[in-house]
Amino acid sequence: MADRYGQQPQSYRGNSGFGNLGRRNDDYDPYGDGYPSDRYGTSTNPASRPSTASRNAPPPRSAQRGRTGAGDMQIQSNAERQIGNVLDLIKREWPAMVETDCIPVQLALQLLDTSSVGRAHEYRNFQQTHQFLQESLKNIVHDHHQGFNSSIGTFHKIQGSIQSSQKKVRALKESLAASKTALCTTNPELKQLHATSRMYDGVLQTLNELDDLRTVPDQLEARISEKRFLTAVEVLQNALRKLRKPELDNIGALSDLRSYLANQETALMDILVEELHEHLYLKSPYCQERWQNLAKVQGISHETYGDAPGVAPFHGILDTIDWEKSVAEDPQKNPEADTFYYVTLLVEALNRLGRLETAVDMLKQRLPVELFAVVNETINDVDQKHPSSLRGGASGSHGLNIYGHRETRMRADVIHDLLSTLYGKFEAIAEGHRVLHEAIKALIRREGAGNNSVLLGGFKELWNLYQNEIRALLHNYVTTDADVYQFSRTPRPGMGMNGRADSARDNLFKFSEVDAKSAEMASEYEALDSIIRAAVPGLTDSTRRDNKKGSLIIPRSEPITSRKSAGYGSGSSQQNSGTYKSLVEPSVFNMSLLLPPTLIFLQRLKSIVPPGSDLATSTLTSFLDNFLVNVFQPQLDETLGKLSDTVFGEADAFQQDSDWAQVAKRPVYKGTTAFFTVITAFCRMLGTIPHDQALSTLIITQMVRYYDRCFSWYKALVTKTQEGGDKQIREKEKLRASAILATEPSEVRETIQRLWKSENLNDLELLYREVNQLIAWANGRDLDASDIIQDRDMIQSMCLLYTSMKWLSVKIHGLRHITRNETDSSKSSFPTKAEKKRWTLLNDPSKATGGEAPVYLPMTEETVENFDSILVSYDELASTALLTLHLEIRTRILHSLQTALSPLTTAPYLLDQEVNEPDPEILSLNSEMVAYDEILVRCLRLREVQFVRNGLGKLINGFLIKNAPMTAPMNAKGCGRMQLNILVLQQNLKNIEEGVDLVRASNYFEMFERGVDAILEKAREGVASSGSQETGDAGRKSEDAGEEGAETPNSRKSAEIFGDDKDRFSYDELKALVELCYSEQLADPERGVAAAAKRQMADKLLNLSEYMWQS
């Protein structure tokens, strides 16, 4: 063994008979780690590392059993240590031998070279090393000879197996060659058998197909009943393909099956289309929850436009659908439970059936009919939910009613329920059509069919019908006349060739005008029903007869009769020829209830419109512009005009409102509150629609009309009654005296206006100036009874005119609101882009309820000027009415005093006996002043009452003193009559004007009773001493100033000095009193008496003048 392995030491270097267990590379490495291919390495400390033999040789079993841990060293044998030492020695002594490029011949030559450069002297060491290496190898062999022996035996067995396999493969190749040669040999019998076998296979396949076709009807019906339509289409098409095979053409028994399957193909398409209609138009019970939740969202107008928590967002549903993959059926779930999934499944089934385009055409054709059915059903459902007796029927007002809060709330509930339900259904239908659109679009994209506009154009048709239905709703519930505006230019039904209505088509009667509860109608209906039941039994249901007696008749309690659905535009007029029942009476005020839900619906519809479609979302509200300008605005103008005419024309429009305390602090006209109610209602309604100056202008126009009406009423109050006479009387002279002073520019009017505008209504300077001007004005004309307002109701109406105008001015001023939106449809024939955008400004649907929201009238800077001017007109009319009231009591006093002082109209003041009763004119004046004051207190505020009251005593005092000469001639008993009249007036005035008395006038006439000497004594005592020279000037010029009615410094000084002093009189006043003292003598028929009296009077007047000038 040692010789065998020793002959080739290098072939087994480092293997030890066990292979290359210690190598890290696949190529043989004879040296180790120290060199690129060195097997042993070049460690400088051989004792610190195991030997190469120990690393390459497998550990002995004893060493494997002796492992005590992961860090224990392998126990080496003596042979392994010996070979390691040899290797270390070679590396140390003969390093060239371990190099990869070692040349043994070169080393051998060096060992044989005995020269100084040779290594012959190391030859013995080389031999010893070689001998040491041989012994080490032998020891290794001896230690591992059993492993070597077993390896040799195993090698021979493997070699034998390989040789045996080679022999078998060679024999197999020879057999295959022989088989190939045998198969190439021709055999007619085998060929005949093969043909017969193929024929039998065909017959068996045909029989199997016939057996499969026999079960197709049952399978098809089962799949259709389970609504697994994809499987049903697949079964049907597979069966039809089988029947189209040529080998089955001659089988006559299949003709019935062919006919059946052909019919089933059409029937299946009809079923699929019907199923689509069931889910697109919400007929399926599985669709109810979706549209009901959407209806709730439509009803929440004061919240966001987003989806409610109970409704899955539609865009989220679209995102969850994988349009890139064709839909697949799930037998484990009900396909109808998910409407959108079911629609895509039906579209896929129709496409696989090859009838998708036909189905889309059928959907488009039936779309108007289906929508009409949805709207009609919704109206009927809402009609049953809300009793007609609670929502108000047709009252013959033609939409001119302004309902109270309760009626408005009930009508709003009806419209709210109708629109929320209808728009909820419309939105659900639109979502279904969007899913249908997306399913067809994805189908076309997957099949690469391009952009098929025929299949994808249905959404625009849906929108056109939606637009018509919305327009019809707005038209039915806003306009009171069906012919106010025609949305279609086509002739209306019943119109002749000349455009006139065909009289033959006129309705002779209307069911809405029939009283369904009358006994005559009930008996007629019973007779008709019995005839029908006798002629066609079963046609009418006897169990429902009692409950449906009036089903053929629309009761009178129902609102306005059914109105035609607006089948306007795009070919829908013929299909949409049915009628809708109006649930509430049409009125422009319904616009505030109709428009916000409509805008919410349109806002939500924008998110449903498929992107890239031929329907631009920005144009969804364009039809509302047309409706607003061409329908709503004329209807608003007409309704507003009619309502105003109703307010103006009411018999009690200018009567006191019985419920004035609920709206004002003082009584106002009933017509004024009604007019403001109209204005408020319209402003509230305008607040719910986009701003349009044309609409605001309509309201301002009615305000102007109301001013004109009130001003006409004022003129009617102050115009004299014509009792014949000259008809050519001037317009100015038709008015009563107080109205002339209150309306025409004059100093009296200016003074009174200054007094009213001053903070102190007791300004003595203005009061005495007014008194002097009024006396001067009255002395320049003769007042008669026609100059005075005799009717107390007219006085009260004048007070109400003032309070009404002031109240209306304040209330309307609260409506003032300036907006930056200057849209004015009246200035343009066609809607501009700005006008189309105005609907987007209404993003706050909280205005729909509007009950608690502030009401205002939006106006531009231009429009507000007209608004402010009408408010000024209201204030001016109120001021005119107040001035008229102020002057009326004064003209009445002046007229009564003129009558009482004039001896020509009443008894003379030359009396033979004392008078114990005041003059009837004075008593009449007292009663009129008391009644006048009562009316003022009842109707006006305290400031206005004081404005009218203040100065009455001063006016009576002044007039009695200034016009004392009117009573001439007068004696002592006549003066007593005057004193009695003054006393009666004073007692009465104390109940009207606070702190008033007529002592000055009483003192004045008391000096008459004492005589001329007493007058002079008064003057001598300096009664008028403070008047000085100015008083004398005033005395000489007062007549001219009084007659001209002009205010001079002297007259003002006289007013200041003598106006408020009970015992001081001016020169003119004392002079007139002296003349009055001699009036009886001057009137004596004897000339001597009169001449003597005149001389005495001249002397007394001279003395009076001297006293006055000396003072």
From Swiss-Prot:
InterPro entries: Sec8/EXOC4, Sec8_exocyst_N, Sec8_M. Coiled coil: none annotated. Pfam families: Sec8_C (PF20652), Sec8_N (PF04048). Keywords: Exocytosis, Protein transport, Transport. Signal peptide: none annotated. GO terms for biological process: exocytosis; Golgi to plasma membrane transport; protein transport; vesicle docking involved in exocytosis; vesicle tethering involved in exocytosis. Residues 42-55 have a biased composition (Polar residues). Residues 1-79, 1023-1057 are annotated as: Disordered. Residues 31-41 have a biased composition (Low complexity). One of its GO terms (cellular component) is exocyst. PANTHER family: EXOCYST COMPLEX COMPONENT 4. Belongs to the SEC8 family. Component of the exocyst complex involved in the docking of exocytic vesicles with fusion sites on the plasma membrane. The exocyst complex is composed of sec3, sec5, sec6, sec8, sec10, sec15, exo70 and exo84. This is Probable exocyst complex component sec8. It comes from Neurospora crassa (strain ATCC 24698 / 74-OR23-1A / CBS 708.71 / DSM 1257 / FGSC 987). The lineage of its organism: Eukaryota, Fungi, Dikarya, Ascomycota, Pezizomycotina.
